[in-house]
Amino acid sequence: MAKLSKRLQAFAAKVDRQKLYAIDEALSLVKECASAKFDESIDVAVQLGIDAKKSDQVVRGSVVLPAGTGKSVRVAVFAQGEKAEQARAAGAEVVGMEDLAEQVKAGKLDFDIVIASPDTMRVVGTLGQILGPRGLMPNPKVGTVTPDVATAVKNAKAGQVQFRVDKAGIIHATIGRASFEPTALRSNLNALVDALQKAKPATSKGVYLRKVALSSTMGVGVRVDQASIAAQ
């Protein structure tokens, strides 16, 4: 831990916490800090100008990152008949109905995302106490309850990320890995910001995107000049 602490202290000394860095410089700094022995994730935190306590200002959605996430995703799908076959053909690892529900109840949750056809919600709805706390409960707002299960599976495999504002009004998301080229990370960040703009609540007043900061898994935060994101 001592070496890690010294490394972070040395990096933190390079970062001006009050400065807004242009996106290219911010990405360079964050990638420089990502010197752990594993491929660190590159994460973004976006402070939104909303009141998260108001139900009509909860920002939630999903976006397919053009350069992917760098993570392989296991997908489970609740579907039957033709839709079940379509889900399997699209690459879903687990497809079922009552049998899949029993697997979930038994604690066998070896998947990262759950997708459901609308006609299966009578079964899926009974699993809320298990799937909900794990962030796995299908929801139409993020595209995981849909009649087009094949496209949903393909999106999940292609690098779709879900986002939801927390109680402090902040969106947290991963936009790639330290091994990604800066151009890939930049395009992913642009896609996320575009999705957040489209999800802006009608009742949100004033500045909507207030602060943007980047960091690696083991690194420190680097604030980003939003104008440099818009300029890409």
UniProtKB/Swiss-Prot annotation:
GO terms for biological process: regulation of translation; translation. GO terms for cellular component: cytosolic large ribosomal subunit. Keywords: Repressor, Ribonucleoprotein, Ribosomal protein, RNA-binding, rRNA-binding, Translation regulation, tRNA-binding. CDD domains: Ribosomal_L1. PROSITE patterns: RIBOSOMAL_L1. The gene is rplA. Part of the 50S ribosomal subunit. Binds directly to 23S rRNA. The L1 stalk is quite mobile in the ribosome, and is involved in E site tRNA release. This is Large ribosomal subunit protein uL1. The keyword Cell cycle does not apply. GO terms for molecular function: rRNA binding; structural constituent of ribosome; tRNA binding.
